[in-house]
């Protein structure tokens, strides 16, 4: 019998009434018998117009087979049945559900998609264990207020209904991770959605939305946002602060401008095709460090900026059906797997080259650089210089982008000619990543009055020399994927440093010197061997908002870390500690910090 607390109003003798009634041939007794053992019942695609009573009362009535054998020594002990936890009644012809739904309080999964439901019973509020509810592909026009009582719900699928508004109290779904409201008739999204702090995936596509609430940026764990096929004309600038966002879909809207994404460093896919975007500028691109897919098809773009070369991770670029007449030759230096150019009035690339596919187009663009051909946007300005080593330094990047780029050359040292190429130009960024460097190039000191960004990732550095420590204007330092296990005390002189990336090195502790750099806002030190952090010193770092300690050797998390209230992103997954439990980590940074504070000894 059901081991859950008896439902209010239920007959206490119900478990000893004869069962099997009102089932007919629609639900075979063998299926019910198996469900009492497994706790799962699948009645999809049975042409049901209503749910038989024997289903609602599966854990209430005596099963029919018990009438044949009432012996306590029987092999089949019906009284030891399992509570029904999963019920699938999808792909039927149900027009309503009765309040008998409350007779299944142990349900964790209820799947009733693809029916003809116009409403849900108020008794749904009693399914307090429900974690997944699928009511998609029905005819719901409104949701009952009682649905907000389902506080343990993690997945809610409401797509393909006729909803015109969101129920009040929706923000009470504090554990909700996956919400699909696509293909409805929604015109607004309430600001209270921002309280869905656990949400990872939100699908609002194919509605009638004209705007998104600015408060959406409070969804600190959101990774997937789909707003395709709406009426959006602008995107709130606050969206640019969503640091966890990885996939953003804005296709088929009315956007005229591409938003900037200064904080979306994890964004992997940006889909803004089929809008009315007229301009693509450097400001739109320079922060998209992780972008893999960029969809700009069917817009009104007239040009592609030279800064497209900044998207070094880009694999797929769709520029089809725009008004682009020429491409920057630097595009050929990207490692694209797919480039779509159809439907543009290109004058500088022959159709036969485009028809040969992506790699031939890239090869052609690279050949124009090698020929020192003029850029389409300027006259005969030199774009590259060949060094004695036969490698090339991008002069155009130096002049226009203020970047000294000698990356991905597998070089063991940086040739003097690279630094000589700077001449009197202002350089703000250095990129020597993806080489074989064992030490910091000594001539970097020549740029100490200019450089703010340095990327030395993916090298073989085992120590940091003083040449780096004199770059007093440095704000961003990328040292990931090296062999470092310590930082020199002189790093403290980097008084403007805001972001440091030490991931994939050999640190066994958070370098002490970092605690004394009070300008730091972001510390990334995942995938090392860090065994401890000092919460008292970290509390003094009032500007620190992001701390990534994933995949280290932390055996415990000090409760005092909860006092670091300025942290907006704290990542702890992949460590061997037992507390906080995974369920606490799933609540996000605010939940973790609150949990830790509650454990501080008084």
UniProtKB/Swiss-Prot annotation:
Pfam families, sorted: LRR_1 (PF00560), LRR_8 (PF13855)
Keyword Phosphoprotein: yes
Any one GO cellular component localisation term in the record: cytoplasm
Region (Disordered): 1-22
Record bears the keyword Cytoplasm: no
SMART domains linked: LRR_BAC (SM00364), LRR_SD22 (SM00365), LRR_TYP (SM00369)
Protein name per UniProt: Leucine-rich repeat-containing protein 40
């Amino acid at each position: 019998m059901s081991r859950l607390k008896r439902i209010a109003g239920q007959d206490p003798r119900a478990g000893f009434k004869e069962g099997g009634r009102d089932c007919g041939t629609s639900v075979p007794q063998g299926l019910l018998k198996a469900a009492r053992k497994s706790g799962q019942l699948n009645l999809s695609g049975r042409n049901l117009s209503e749910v038989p009573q024997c289903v609602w009362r599966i854990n209430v009535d005596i099963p029919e087979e018990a009438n044949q054998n009432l012996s306590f020594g029987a092999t089949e002990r019906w009284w030891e049945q399992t509570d029904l936890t999963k019920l699938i009644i999808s792909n039927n012809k149900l027009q309503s559900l009765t309040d008998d739904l409350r007779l299944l309080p142990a349900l964790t999964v209820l799947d009733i998609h693809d029916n003809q439901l116009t409403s849900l019973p108020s008794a749904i509020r009693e399914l307090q264990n429900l974690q997944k509810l699928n009511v998609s592909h029905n005819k719901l026009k409104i949701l009952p207020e009682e649905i907000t009582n389902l506080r343990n719900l993690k997945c809610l699928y409401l797509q393909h209904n006729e909803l015109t508004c969101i129920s009040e109290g929706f923000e009470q779904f504090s554990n909700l991770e996956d919400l699909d409201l696509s293909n409805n008739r929604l015109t607004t999204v309430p600001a209270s959605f921002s309280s869905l702090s656990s949400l990872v995936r939100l699908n609002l596509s194919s509605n009638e939305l004209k705007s998104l609430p600015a408060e959406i940026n409070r969804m600190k764990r959101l990774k997937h946002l789909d707003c395709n096929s709406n009426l959006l004309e602008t995107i709130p600038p606050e969206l640019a602060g969503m640091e966890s966002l990885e996939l953003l879909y804005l296709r088929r809207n009315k956007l005229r401008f591409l938003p900037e994404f200064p904080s979306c460093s994890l964004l992997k896919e940006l889909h803004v095709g089929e809008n009315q975007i007229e301009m693509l500028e450097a400001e739109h691109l320079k922060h998209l460090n992780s972008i893999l897919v960029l969809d700009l098809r069917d817009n009104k773009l007239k040009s592609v900026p030279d800064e497209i070369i900044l998207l070094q991770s880009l694999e797929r670029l769709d520029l089809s059906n725009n008004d682009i007449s020429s491409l920057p030759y630097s595009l050929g230096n990207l490692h694209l797997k797919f480039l779509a150019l159809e439907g543009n009035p290109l004058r500088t690339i022959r159709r036969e080259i485009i028809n040969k596919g992506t790699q031939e187009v890239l090869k052609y663009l690279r050949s124009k650089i090698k020929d020192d051909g003029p850029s389409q946007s300027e006259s005969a300005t030199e774009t590259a210089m060949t060094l004695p080593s036969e490698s090339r330094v991008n002069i155009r990047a130096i002049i226009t982008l203020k970047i000294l780029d000698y990356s991905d050359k597998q070089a063991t040292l940086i040739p003097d000619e690279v630094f000589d190429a700077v001449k009197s130009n202002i350089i703000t960024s250095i990129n020597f990543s993806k080489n074989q460097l064992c030490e910091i190039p000594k001539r970097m000191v020549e740029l100490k009055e200019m450089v703010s960004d340095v990327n030395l990732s993916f090298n073989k550095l085992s120590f940091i020399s003083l040449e780096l420590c004199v770059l007093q204007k440095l704000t961003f330092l990328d040292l990931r994927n090296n062999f470092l296990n310590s930082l020199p005390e002189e790093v403290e002189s980097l008084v403007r440093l805001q972001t440091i990336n030490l991931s994939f090195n050999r640190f066994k502790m958070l370098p002490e010197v970092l605690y004394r750099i009070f300008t730091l806002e972001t510390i990334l030190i995942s995938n090392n061997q860090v065994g401890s952090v000092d919460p008292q010193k970290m509390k003094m770092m009032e500007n620190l908002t992001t701390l990534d300690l994933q995949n280290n050797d932390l055996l415990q998390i000090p409760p005092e870390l909860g006092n670091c209230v300025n942290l907006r992103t704290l990542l702890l997954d992949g460590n061997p500690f037992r507390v906080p439990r995974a369920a606490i980590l799933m609540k996000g940074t605010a939940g973790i910090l609150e949990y830790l504070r509650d454990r501080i000894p008084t």
